[in-house]
């Protein structure tokens, strides 16, 4: 039987460590010798079962990206970033292919407004027993103003964002990993954290497998508008073309700064 809502176990939730705002909290991901239920290890990259499985009817895993607690995706060396993304995408798609779950999600939280609790760089892969996330996704949320198209990889700025305001999309063919995908992803995140027109300290990455393509939606996070919270109405800003030109000039022109 399919479901529309995930059920959250508060008795587990209250035990979760919080190290984004609480800097005195010991980082559980740094104590690598104490980690349990490891699934796969590739050098500093570790996939393991989530110690605090707060979601019912779900298989929850955590992907620790690095052994550097203060690392951040926009500053990883490119070979390392490609290795990390290939590791994440492979494990996500393999779990989906098992057919055990209604759908499988791969996402990342970064920063105090992202909804995350642990500051150490990580992603999550979650198998949902009775929810198909794809049923709530319209193709139009991936459409937008072209920023860069190269080697079969496209970067756009949403004209019909899912939640509202600014959402970047990158897509590539699902047959194999394309390094341009990683380059575009890193540049987009760097733009959000360093050159955004408003101070941005948080973002989410949401990966989607749709029509034989891999998408990542990159969402800078601010306090969510009440129009979306209360009524589900996304807002579209009137400076999208300016922003597309801004990131293009800073990151994708010959004289770009990054």
What are these regions (language model features)?
Residues 1-79, 83-91, 95-114, 118, ...:
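Active-site microenvironments that recognize anionic phosphate/pyrophosphate groups
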Residues 181:
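Hydrophobic (often cysteine-bearing) scaffold residues that line and stabilize catalytic clefts
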Residues 122:
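Conserved, mostly hydrophobic/aromatic
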């Amino acid at each position: 039987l399919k479901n529309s809502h995930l059920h959250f176990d508060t008795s587990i939730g209250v035990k979760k460590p919080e190290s984004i705002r609480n800097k005195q909290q010991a980082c559980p991901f740094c104590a690598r010798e104490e980690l349990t239920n490891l699934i796969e290890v590739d050098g500093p990259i570790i996939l393991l079962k989530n110690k605090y499985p707060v979601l019912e009817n779900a298989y929850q895993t955590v992907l620790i990206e690095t052994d550097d607690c203060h690392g951040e995706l926009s500053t990883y060396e490119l070979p390392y970033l490609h290795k990390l993304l290939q590791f994440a995408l492979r494990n996500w798609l393999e779990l989906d292919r098992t057919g055990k779950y209604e759908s499988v999600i791969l996402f990342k939280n970064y920063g105090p407004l992202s909804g995350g609790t642990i500051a150490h760089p990580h992603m999550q892969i979650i198998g949902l027993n009775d929810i198909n996330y794809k049923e709530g996704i319209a193709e139009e949320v991936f459409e937008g103003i072209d920023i860069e198209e190269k080697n079969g990889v496209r970067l756009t700025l949403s004209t019909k964002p899912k939640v509202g305001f600014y959402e970047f999309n990158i897509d590539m063919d699902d047959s194999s990993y394309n390094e341009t995908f990683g380059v575009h992803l890193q540049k987009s995140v760097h733009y959000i954290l360093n050159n955004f027109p408003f101070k941005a300290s948080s973002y989410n990455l949401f990966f989607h497998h749709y029509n034989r393509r891999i998408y990542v939606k990159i969402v800078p996070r601010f306090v969510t508008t009440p129009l979306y919270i209360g009524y589900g109405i996304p807002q579209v800003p009137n400076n999208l073309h300016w922003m597309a030109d801004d990131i293009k000039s800073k990151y994708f022109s010959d004289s770009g700064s990054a």
